[in-house]
């Protein structure tokens, strides 16, 4: 699909060259983005979802984004709606747990959430799930560094089920927010071990620090 130059500028004109490189990459099957604090990770992910829909031949039912909290999923959906409008409502943005509950056709509960990912992995690997339930061709992962061993096994199971699946994993390899639940920074680093070839890209510019410096300079040297 082709966007007019003016529409492209409207959607993506404020992105940095590094962010645009990731947006325009439509050939790499496996992409890992190491994004430092304040580097525009959320903006990148929202715009990558938009580019998959509007610039590539990805249908909304083929696209899944997973994150680690319902609050994050809600925020991503809100920002995507602001960017591309009503089309965003058809994109699945879920937590790992809610995706597994949907996959198995079960109602979510706190008790079941402890085991639902392992159950999903077993069902996928034993081919005990109806094929029409696993239809995703593109998987986008937020905070990939926070994947624990169970979530990483789910990722591998989905990849083995569909060897053509594209994976776009974005995270900070220096930070594991959910370390208390078994997550380690090895998750994002392990992508290179399991997924070949892997295109690794970096976002290092800290917009937040840059803005703090500008704000401080404005206070010290008012116009």
Regions found by a protein language model. Give the residues of each.
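Conserved catalytic network of the ASCE P-loop NTPase/AAA+ motor domain
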Residues: 55-58, 85-86, 131-133, 147, ...
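P-loop NTPase Walker
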Residues: 1-109
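Hydrophobic residues in beta-strands of the RecA-like P-loop NTPase core, especially within AAA+ ATPase
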Residues: 141-147, 171
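Conserved RecA-like helicase ATPase core segment
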Residues: 152-223
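Loop/turn-to-beta-strand initiation segments
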Residues: 63, 136-138, 163-168
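Structural preference for long, well-ordered alpha-helical segments in enzyme cores
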Residues: 45-49, 72, 76-80, 120-126, ...
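Conserved helicase/translocase P-loop NTPase motor core
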Residues: 18-19, 25-30, 93-138, 148-157
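Conserved SAM-binding loop
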Residues: 65, 93, 140, 169, ...
């Amino acid at each position: 699909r082709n966007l007019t130059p003016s529409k492209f500028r409207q959607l993506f004109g404020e992105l940095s060259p590094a962010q645009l490189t990731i947006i325009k990459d439509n050939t790499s099957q496996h992409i890992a983005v190491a994004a430092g604090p304040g580097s525009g990770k959320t903006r990148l992910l929202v715009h990558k979802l938009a580019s998959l829909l509007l610039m590539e031949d990805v249908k909304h039912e083929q696209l899944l984004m997973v994150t680690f909290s319902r609050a994050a999923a809600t925020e991503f959906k809100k920002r995507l709606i602001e960017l591309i409008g009503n089309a965003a409502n058809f994109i699945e943005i879920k937590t790992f747990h809610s995706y597994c509950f949907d996959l198995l056709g079960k109602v979510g509960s706190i008790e079941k959430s402890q085991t639902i990912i392992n159950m999903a992995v077993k069902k996928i690997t034993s081919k005990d799930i109806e094929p029409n339930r696993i239809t995703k061709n593109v998987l986008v992962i937020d905070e990939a560094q926070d994947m624990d061993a169970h979530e990483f096994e789910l990722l591998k199971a989905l990849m083995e089920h569909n060897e053509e699946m594209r994976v776009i994993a974005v995270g900070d390899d220096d930070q594991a927010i959910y370390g208390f639940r078994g997550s380690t920074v090895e998750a994002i680093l392990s992508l290179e071990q399991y997924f070949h070839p892997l295109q690794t890209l970096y976002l290092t510019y800290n917009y937040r620090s840059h803005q703090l410096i500008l704000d401080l300079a404005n206070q010290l040297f008012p116009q």
